[in-house]
Amino acid sequence: MHELAMKKCIGKPIPEWDAAHRLEIDQSTGPNLQDFGTIFRINSIFMDVIEPSFLEKQWFIFGITISFAAALNGPYIYSYAYLGSDPLSERLITHLMALTFIFIFGGITWKFGRGLFYGLRHQPIRFHRSLNRLYAIRSRRYFAKPGEGDIVWEAPWSTESIFCLHREETSFGVFFHIRHYTLSDNGNVARVFSIGREWTGYGQIGMALAQWNYWCAYMNDGPGDLPKPMLFHTQQETLREAFLFSLYSFGLRAPAIVRLLMMPLILVFTVMRVLANATCRDPIWPESIERISQIAPDDPYAEPRPGTPVGWGDTILAQQRGEYPDNPQAPVKDWKGEMDEQKNAAAWLENPAAATRRTARGRP
């Protein structure tokens, strides 16, 4: 979800649906824990995670490009009216149309295009288990002082923190993602950011809950017993990776015929993603965060390490060779609730608090 789309919550109470579907850091939400492609790197000290727009930014770039092209029609319409011999009244109408194109579509381009171009290639969210805090890079700092880094928000990892499963209903369907809310003194939303990836439709709620369990297991118990992530995303995106991001945005397991039909659009998405990345730079952590994020050279849990596949292409090839697990997951320790992931997700959606109480009592 685009950052500006979340700002509609600022100054208002937490959305009612979100408030009813809070995620607790000390209570498992399902029988499994699994990562579904949200991780850059992991070690004993911290874990860097993506935010939703990282996977889908080619769609935003495509929309911004169309909006920019529409805005360029304004000067064309104006020149047509200026050079024409139409009556003054008709030329005034044409001038008004030109200004409308410029201001409306130009405004959309400026509002939603900032950050996609000349911003950051990615905005990692750092789960820092040593300090029980989250550090989220939110935007590029263009005139930073030495050591200041980019703009970072902090959030405590505590039972008082407000994490929710957010539901977004659009004309393309229902989407879910995990959010953190920071409230002001009057109880309204002061800050909000999303973590990880989006989940499409109610059928993927079980996956979202398994992903939350994965992050909680890391923060609460460390990386020792975690299954491998689905993949480690590259922080140095290549042309091949840009193509695979665009290809898989139509579905990881989309039929070959669908991919062939969508190939022209996939290629356009690839070019746009590459061009946008070329205008951006890598994020810079403030020195204060870098100092507390030093890992030991012999950290046994530091990944990716030499030999570990990174990115879509290398990971898929490693899986085909049997060198990297396919669909790695693990059961939640001491889980007492419903063992069927879909049934558990349905019960949690209907009433999260009641589902948690039943699980605590050992009832499915």
Mark where each language-model region is.
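Short, surface-exposed beta-strand/loop "edge" segments at domain boundaries and coil↔beta transitions
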Residues: 2-3, 48-62, 144-145, 185-193
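Alpha-helical transmembrane spans
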Residues: 49-122, 239-323, 327-364
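Short, non-transmembrane cytosolic segments of multipass membrane proteins
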Residues: 1-39, 201
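Short, hydrophobic/proline-enriched secondary-structure or compact coil segments at domain edges
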Residues: 40-56, 176-178
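A membrane-cytosol interface segment of integral membrane proteins
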Residues: 155-230
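Acidic, Ser/Thr-rich low-complexity segments on the non-lumenal side of membrane proteins
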Residues: 135-173, 312-327
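Conserved beta-hairpin
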Residues: 108-149, 153-154
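Juxtamembrane amphipathic/hinge helix adjacent to a transmembrane helix
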Residues: 42-45, 215-250
